[in-house]
Amino acid sequence: MPFDFRRFDIYRKVPKDLTQPTYTGAIISICCCLFILFLFLSELTGFITTEVVNELYVDDPDKDSGGKIDVSLNISLPNLHCELVGLDIQDEMGRHEVGHIDNSMKIPLNNGAGCRFEGQFSINKVPGNFHVSTHSATAQPQNPDMTHTIHKLSFGDTLQVQNVHGAFNALGGADRLTSNPLASHDYILKIVPTVYEDKSGKQRYSYQYTVANKEYVAYSHTGRIIPAIWFRYDLSPITVKYTERRQPLYRFITTICAIIGGTFTVAGILDSCIFTASEAWKKIQLGKIH
């Protein structure tokens, strides 16, 4: 007797003339297909969309930076002449720089009555401060007006990623134009190292920061102290890492198979129950079942 390979077929075909179509079965089949289509599109969207997950760990991620952090500052002082505006930098490693001018620019505002300071500089990875003041001016003004607007203050590379909502420019748009003109302003910054890793494994390094601020008129035993805008910073030991991830193909295929198989199975059970109940009801109406 020749071997019949067809005996391994677990999907035996039933002739159409031995099956009975029903309206209920048609409705269930249409609903089943629509439900499968909806779930398939939902899973496909999730498969195509890149997910960004974050984690925290203790480390210095950017060890190749030489212990430096790049800073970008853009600030307007509408009531202070440009020749009076200067940037001073100091930290716990002994750095003390007055009137930093490298990679900086002063743009006159209000016909020269005000000034917009834009600068890029680097700071050491130790606690310290940088401040905008009149300390570097050859002739100190009597009452410098330190009201200001901060357009940008960022550390490290600028990350422009849709899925990440971090405090990379937390002070952007800060407005102190209605403050006491003679007051100093202290911004206390906690800088948080941040790593962003894309799907290819390429990493970019940046820094987020939290901020608290206070405004005060400072005095010493010799009288009122010349006001300034202070940015006092410290680094957090915690690093935030964002990683782009996409659902693996095998998991997507497994989910689609589960959706199709599970939906058809449940729909088949539901159709069978409805059909059996309707047949039993017909027999009751015909008096065949008492």
Swiss-Prot record:
Annotated glycan sites: N74
Subcellular localization: Endoplasmic reticulum membrane; Endoplasmic reticulum-Golgi intermediate compartment membrane; Golgi apparatus membrane
Keywords carried by this UniProt record: Endoplasmic reticulum, ER-Golgi transport, Glycoprotein, Golgi apparatus, Membrane, Transmembrane, Transmembrane helix, Transport
Membrane topology (UniProt): Multi-pass membrane protein
Annotated GO biological process: endoplasmic reticulum to Golgi vesicle-mediated transport
Example of a GO cellular component annotation carried by this entry: nucleoplasm
All ranges on the Lumenal side of the membrane: 48-254
Residues that span the membrane, as ranges: 27-47, 255-275
Ranges per topology, Cytoplasmic: 1-26, 276-290
Matching Pfam families: COPIIcoated_ERV, ERGIC_N
Superkingdom per UniProt: Eukaryota
Record's function text: Possible role in transport between endoplasmic reticulum and Golgi.
Family: Belongs to the ERGIC family.
PANTHER family, per the entry: ENDOPLASMIC RETICULUM-GOLGI INTERMEDIATE COMPARTMENT PROTEIN, ENDOPLASMIC RETICULUM-GOLGI INTERMEDIATE COMPARTMENT PROTEIN 1
Protein name stated in the entry: Endoplasmic reticulum-Golgi intermediate compartment protein 1
Lineage of producing organism: Eukaryota, Metazoa, Chordata, Craniata, Vertebrata
Gene expressing this chain: Ergic1
